[in-house]
UniProtKB/Swiss-Prot annotation:
Organism lineage string: Bacteria, Bacillati, Cyanobacteriota, Cyanophyceae, Nostocales
Any one Gene Ontology BP term: glycolytic process
This protein's name: Enolase
Cellular component terms per the entry's GO annotation: cell surface; extracellular region; phosphopyruvate hydratase complex
Binding site for Mg(2+): D247, E288, D315
Keywords: Cytoplasm, Glycolysis, Lyase, Magnesium, Metal-binding, Secreted
S-S bonds: none
Predominant subcellular localization, coarse grouping: cytoplasm
Length: 429
């Protein structure tokens, strides 16, 4: 059992670093009296929900085009650190509630969600290090043994790529694998085969922010056809072994009550019918942000139409916020929630939102952001919470692969206790 003297916070240090897009982000270290240290880095999104917690940027055009985070770094070093020194790192909720109270706003706009989250995650890592246990075990206890099904973003569009594709992500989902290691191999083989399929058709094989290919395509259906072709060419059965998933990111092309895709506006009911047709025609198991983040009435209609056949994930809709998730539960809008740590800005609030969803039959998908770092916290979080699903990009770009490799290590550590979510029917449905 830990001694509070040993696990007391001795020092907190933050610095400005770069994310995978070459933009500044914040890194924090939490040092304990025992000598244990926790290090955490915070990601940043491109397609952001209106209701996300506030990411504090400097807006000084003379540095990084105004995207610097020196204000957030200052807030950690000069505002948060003095109030957190001597607190017990094991008491995660006390640390997080103290920071939230110091900020005093409803969306962390005073000190910055990026500042608060960096310290929150670093404190958790320091706590785990002080006990000599991995982060997933520290957060999840002895039941943390479920390896997630990866939703692998292999064709990028929308805000994640400089192409003409409307939907933001087209994903492959190795639901039929028996282990995470096998699932990762299947995904990597399909990804490599997709490169060949694109090349044979004279399409570009450059990649977007999340490591997926970003070709110009005639329609969203063409992207789905390419994925089915790649799955089959790689030697797998579409749907049975490797399924498909979409991140529509519909808020990005919602204009004046209409959904503008394929070059023209469509009424919400027409768009819902279109999504239903895609579910009928392709082995799709999950659709994320199928409608605008404030289009609650039509979210209900979409859920009534296809919610029994496919997972409907709220990202911009819920923004990892328990209050918005509660509204979705009450209104029967969607049936799953995307979990992004920096949307809410603390580990405690993230875990509370996951718990709320679980208690009400909503599945959780633990997710990265398009602007990532080498930080692998979300891999441990997925196992700790038994979420059963993770989104962390494609099968290239080291900031994406780092999370997959972390999950491989966790699976090895767990040994015979490791269970792959897809093998026991706990992946997306």
């Amino acid at each position: 059992m830990s001694n509070i003297v040993d696990t007391a916070i001795e020092a907190i240090v933050a610095r400005e670093i770069l994310d995978s897009r070459g933009r500044p982000t914040i890194e924090a270290e939490v040092h304990l009296l025992s000598g244990a240290v926790g290090l955490a880095q915070v990601p940043s999104g491109a397609s952001t929900g209106t209701f996300e917690a506030h990411e504090l940027r400097d807006k000084d055009k003379s540095r990084y085009g105004g995207k610097g985070v020196l204000k957030a770094v200052h807030n950690v070093n000069e505002v948060l650190a003095p109030k957190l020194i001597d607190l017990d790192a094991i008491n995660q909720e006390l640390i997080d509630r103290t920071m939230i109270a110091l900020d005093g706003s409803g969306n962390k706009s005073n000190l910055g969600a990026n500042a608060i989250l960096a310290v929150s995650l670093a404190a958790a890592r320091a706590g785990a290090a002080s006990l000599g246990i991995p982060l997933y075990r520290y957060l999840g206890g002895p039941l943390a043994n479920l390896l997630p099904v990866p939703l692998m973003n292999v064709i990028n569009g929308g805000a994640h790529a400089a192409n003409n594709v409307d939907f933001q992500e087209f994903m492959i989902v190795p639901v039929g694998a028996t282990s995470f290691r096998e699932a990762l191999r299947w995904g990597a083989e399909v990804f490599a085969t997709l490169s060949e399929v694109l090349h044979d058709k004279g399409l570009l094989t450059g990649v977007g922010d999340e490591g997926g290919f970003a070709p110009n395509l005639e329609s969203n259906q063409v992207a789905l056809e390419l994925l089915v072709a790649a799955i089959e060419k790689a030697g797998y059965k579409p749907g049975e072994q490797v399924a498909l998933a979409l991140d529509v990111a519909a808020s990005e092309f919602y204009k004046e009550g209409q959904y503008v895709y394929d070059g023209r506006p469509h009424a919400p009911t027409e768009f819902i019918d279109y999504l239903g047709q895609l579910v009928d025609q392709y082995p799709i198991v999950s659709i994320e942000d199928g409608l605008h983040e404030e289009d609650w009435q039509n979210w209900q209609l979409l859920t009534q139409k296809v919610g029994s056949r496919v997972q409907l994930v709220g990202d911009d809709l819920f923004v990892t916020n328990a209050t918005r998730l509660q509204k979705g539960i009450q209104e029967k809008a969607g049936n799953a929630i995307l979990i992004k740590l920096n949307q809410i800005g603390s580990l405690t609030e993230t875990l509370e939102t996951i718990d709320l969803g679980t208690r009400n039959g909503f599945r959780s998908v633990i997710s990265h952001r398009s602007g990532e770092t080498e930080d692998t916290t979300i891999a441990d979080l997925a196992v700790a919470t038994r979420a059963g699903q993770i989104k962390t990009g494609s099968l290239c770009r080291s900031e994406r692969v780092a999370k997959y490799n972390r999950l491989l290590r966790i699976e090895d550590e767990l040994g015979d206790r490791a269970v792959y979510a897809g093998a026991v029917g706990l992946g997306p449905k």
